[in-house]
Curated annotation (Swiss-Prot):
Its EC number is 3.1.-.-. GO terms for biological process: rescue of stalled ribosome. It comes from the Bacteria. PROSITE patterns: SMR. This is Ribosome rescue factor SmrB. Keywords: Endonuclease, Hydrolase, Nuclease, RNA-binding, rRNA-binding. InterPro entries: Smr_dom, Smr_dom_sf, SmrB-like.
Length: 176
């Protein structure tokens, strides 16, 4: 191609676009919507739940007999009291129908509510069978620093389908 062809092509192009105006920007630019306080609180709660509970951690829990666990430094008599039903749970959590991620959040919320209300014992109902929650809930409870012990609940509180959980309230006055 030479300069004459370029000039002819440029002239033809100019003739074709003669009378066309450039488009003006008439579109609105939208910012990303700001998160609500509820969304921020939920995200924060999820972060706390994920920092407490790992799905890959496998604690040493009993294979035979009732599900039970006792933290180091806690009197073994506490486990016996849980088994006998000496502790009456003040708060109940029913996890039937929950997904794992939702169950983790609810479990953290239950433990926080126990501390806030100075409730030393709570009941977590995970359901019968060999479902995911029945396997995961004890593993999650072992990982939480506020949990002192748990034991399979007596019949009146759910039996095989529930756990009684003993919460560490620190130096706060305990209720029984």
């Amino acid at each position: 191609m030479n300069k004459d062809d370029d000039k002819e092509g440029l002239a033809m192009f100019s003739a074709l676009i003669d009378g066309i105006k450039p488009i003006t920007q008439d579109k609105r630019h939208f910012r990303t919507p700001l998160k609500t306080k509820q969304e921020i609180a939920l995200k924060e709660q999820q972060l706390h739940a994920n920092s407490y509970f790992s799905d890959t951690y496998q604690p040493l829990l009993p294979i035979q007999g009732p599900m039970r666990w006792l933290d180091d430094g806690v009197d073994s008599l506490e486990l016996k009291r849980l088994r006998r039903g000496d502790y009456q749970p003040d708060l109940l959590l029913d996890l039937h129908g929950y997904r794992q991620s939702e169950a983790k959040l609810e479990l953290v919320a239950l433990i926080q509510a126990c501390v806030k209300q100075q409730s030393q014992c709570c009941c977590v109902m995970h359901g019968y069978g060999s479902g995911i929650l029945k396997q995961q809930v004890p593993m999650w409870l072992v990982q939480h620093p506020m949990v002192k012990a748990f034991h399979q609940a007596p019949k009146e509180w759910g039996g095989d389908a529930a756990l009684l959980v003993l919460i560490d309230l620190g130096e706060l006055p305990h209720r029984r």
